[in-house]
Amino acid sequence: MEKAAFESRAVLFGNVFGENVLVTNNRLLPGAPTMEIREVRENKKQFLELLLLADEEEAMIDRYLGRGTMYVLEDDGVKSECVVTDEGDGVLEIKNIATVPKHQGKGYARALIEHLTETYRGRFTVLRVGTGESPATLPFYERLGFVRTRRIKNFFIDHYPHPIVEAGVRLVDMIVLERRL
């Protein structure tokens, strides 16, 4: 991975009371394992395998990847990624967020969302995400303070050429959730 492909940087350190903590002043606690969140400006498709975990259709990814801002979280290799877009009227939307399956449940996606909150607070008022009605994803977002705002009927039927199944549930409607920044 080329260093030129990355721009902004945030450093995270270990667990404090069970939570990954974002360090904005670049100070680290001695001996703490480090994670980095970096903005990817070029060659975003190098992370296609990870992007496809959250959005199975490459054509759908292509619709937002070019205009979106992409971040990767590295912790001895890339563990998680997210792509956000400016939807206007103060809304920042998470279009894609995924973690390598064997590293799920370790707080990486949560760290990315907290990074987005810190990075974009003051520039946007709402962080939005659309997801399927899955027992794997809805509780995750709700634990982070997102609330359901609307349902887009038949989204996964109308926009994907094949059934999308997550955690044993066929996705039909998109559930839109929002969190104040």
Residue ranges and their predicted role:
Residues 68, 171-176:
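Short hydrophobic/aromatic beta-strand or adjacent loop that forms the aromatic wall/cage
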Residues 1-12:
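Positively charged N-terminal leader segments that act as targeting/secretion signals
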Residues 120-133:
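Conserved GNAT acetyl-CoA-binding A-motif
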Residues 128-130, 142, 147-170:
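Conserved catalytic-core motifs of GNAT/GCN5-like acyltransferases
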Residues 103, 107-115:
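Conserved acetyl-CoA pyrophosphate-binding loop and the N-cap/start of the following alpha-helix
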Residues 15, 19-43, 175, 181:
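Conserved N-terminal entry element of GNAT/NAT acetyltransferase domains
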Residues 38-101, 113, 180:
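Acetyl-CoA-dependent GNAT
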